[in-house]
Regions:
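Conserved alpha/beta catalytic core and glycan-binding cleft of carbohydrate-active enzymes
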Residues: 130-131, 135-172, 269, 273-431, ...
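Glycine-rich phosphate/pyrophosphate-binding loop
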Residues: 189-218, 439-474, 478-479, 483
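C-terminal beta-strand-rich structural cap/linker in extracellular carbohydrate-active enzymes
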Residues: 553-569
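Bacterial N-terminal signal peptides
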Residues: 9-17
Length: 569
């Protein structure tokens, strides 16, 4: 642990007395959970309109069961203004007509449960659409039910006024994320506070340190912020009473404003977790936070270790010549054919997070998601390379999350025209590829009607083709998931120890997984185009699964380019 992470751990420890602890890691089913994320508009279209829907997802549950996943996370399915891919919600209690209706969601959940699968929804807790009835009524004055559901002001500072002026100069001001205040000139106030786009007014959870000189800053215990908390619980209860098993919370760290150390936000989620444990003990909360030492301490069962804020995930997967590599200014990521990456950034961050949270909750390292590029991007594009990456994703501790299509090796399709706020994220939202053809079996519509076009690999990377090929990516993923389910040392709760020294050889990556029973497995990964060797100092063992060419003899790992092995010691 480097000095920066040491002091961060001390800071977290200092918060322990202030943040009342929620109970344990959560329901028992999490110990064997494997999640599959579905972007509903792009998974399966049941009615030929070119957009995926809930009956379409239900029709593919048997495929998901056979794959080996046992939990689903659906991106937002609520009624939306569709300016930001469903994250601008008009009605939190209603399924958007493009996906079906509330009964369709209940049927999907029921059918999933019959197959032993859980279903979690996306909870967009921080904002609504400006078309939401709460916001429409909030504008009308100071004495209404929803007047303080949002943050209003009649005055703003010079910097905020300058941000508004800059946003006006943008090519599309409504699609600009510059600044936070939006001109409204409504009876309730001249300005409202937005989270991202103008159409996404921030819900008012209060300010951590309100100032009398800024009258719009209400404390977290003020009536408005407390009413918003009750509404959030009502939304959760509404869907959980219909059978939903939990929620992934969008931008969970952002709710309380002016909360630099996140203490007030952590207290909010601790309150939610205690409520959940009391009333819905078999349900879960998953955070988009990417700081597990905060989120899991606050009460979340799972947090993602992704690209937000810190470099752990980015240093592994975002090569410099790919869209997210350019944004993050990373020259050489670890999972790249050149073999010039380093484990240091990932391990320094991940090891600290893992050791601090392993007894409280789970870290998830997803294959990708709707907000960033897939593993198949740039020069990391062959099945051999992608199998090595998938070996990593499916043998690390915590809860695996597979983004739809990554089990096939679907590519991030650069250059797709943006739609509904997708920007360059469109390349990760193309239709699921079921069968060869112009619509990849996703829809019966004409190709021009598709929500997004099929990626250019759609003719060869399909479920139909890969199911028939014993050496396919899909069948390799099935083998990995079956192994994870049957070998306790590879499970969600088993221990983890890196065998590389960070100042020594970086390739291959080698780590141990250890079950409570003492059973141990060694995992070795070589994502580079060079043959590599590492002496591990471990005893003899038996290779359980491999991809590419590799050996394990007398404690020494030898791996050909783009190879991985899993050894039971």
């Amino acid at each position: 642990m480097n000095i920066r992470h040491f002091f961060w751990a001390l800071a977290v420890a200092a918060l322990l007395p202030a943040v009342a602890q929620a109970g344990g890691k959560g329901p028992e089913w999490l110990s064997k959970a494997v999640f599959y994320q579905i972007y509903p508009s792009s998974y399966m279209d049941s009615n030929g309109d070119g957009v995926g829907d809930l009956p379409g997802i239900a029709s593919r549950l048997d495929y998901l069961k056979q794959l080996g996943v046992n939990a689903l996370w659906l991106n937002p399915v609520y009624e939306s203004g569709w300016f930001d891919g469903g994250y601008d919600i008009i009605d939190f209690y209603k399924v958007d007509p493009r996906f079906g209706n509330n009964d369709d969601l209940v049927r999907l959940v029921d059918e999933a449960h019959k197959r032993g699968m859980k279903v979690c929804l996306d909870l967009v807790a921080g904002h609504s659409s400006d078309k939401c009835q709460w916001f429409v009524e909030s504008q009308q004055g100071t004495n209404g039910r929803y007047s303080d559901y949002y943050i209003w002001s009649d005055t703003i500072g010079k910097k905020d006024a300058a941000d508004i002026a800059r946003r006006r100069q943008a090519e599309d001001p409504k699609a600009s994320t510059i600044g936070h205040w939006v001109e409204a000139d409504a009876p309730r106030g001249k300005y409202y506070y937005k989270n991202y786009y103008e159409c996404q007014p921030a819900l008012n959870y209060g300010y951590a340190h309100p100032s009398a000189s800024r009258p719009w800053e209400q404390g977290v215990d003020a009536p408005g912020p407390q009413a918003v908390r009750r509404e959030l619980r009502n939304i959760m209860a509404f869907w959980m009473d219909k059978g939903v098993d939990g929620f992934r919370v969008d931008m969970a760290a952002s709710l309380v404003k002016g909360d630099k150390d996140k203490k007030a936000t952590m207290q909010l989620w601790g309150e939610m977790r205690r409520w959940l444990d009391e009333h819905y003990p078999q349900n879960v909360l998953i955070s988009e936070w990417s700081y597990p030492q905060q989120s899991i301490l606050a009460g979340f069962n799972i947090d993602f270790e992704i690209h937000i804020g810190r470099s752990a995930y980015s240093s592994l997967f975002f090569q410099g010549d790919t869209p997210w590599g350019k944004t993050k200014k990373i020259d050489n990521c670890y999972f790249n054919r050149l073999g010039k990456g380093s484990l240091k950034d990932f391990i320094n961050i991940y090891a600290a997070d893992y050791n601090a949270t392993k007894d409280r909750g789970y870290i998830a390292i997803p294959t990708a998601n709707h907000d960033f590029q897939r593993p198949n991007v740039g020069t990391r594009n062959s099945p051999d390379q992608l199998k090595v990456a998938m070996t990593f994703f499916l043998t690390m501790p915590g809860v695996p999350f597979i983004y739809y299509g990554d089990e096939l090796g679907m590519k991030y399709q650069d250059g797709i025209a943006p739609k509904e706020g997708s920007r360059n994220r469109a390349g990760s939202r193309t239709p699921m590829q079921w069968t060869p053809g112009p619509t990849a079996g996703f829809s019966t519509c004409a190709p021009a009607q598709l929500y997004f076009p099929v990626a250019t690999d759609g003719g060869k990377l399909t479920v139909e083709a890969e199911e028939k090929d014993p050496g396919s990516m899909l069948n390799y993923v099935k083998r990995l998931l079956a192994l994870r389910a049957s070998v306790p040392a590879l499970g969600n709760d088993a221990g983890w120890q890196l065998l590389n020294t960070l100042d020594g050889e970086q390739y291959p990556m080698v780590y141990l997984r250890t079950a409570a029973s003492g059973e141990r497995c060694l995992v070795a990964l070589n994502p580079s185009e060079k043959a590599v060797t590492l002496r591990t100092g471990q005893p003899a063992g038996k290779v359980l699964v491999s991809t590419g060419k590799g050996s394990y003899k007398h404690g020494t790992v030898k791996l050909a380019p783009f190879s991985a092995i899993i050894v039971r010691l």
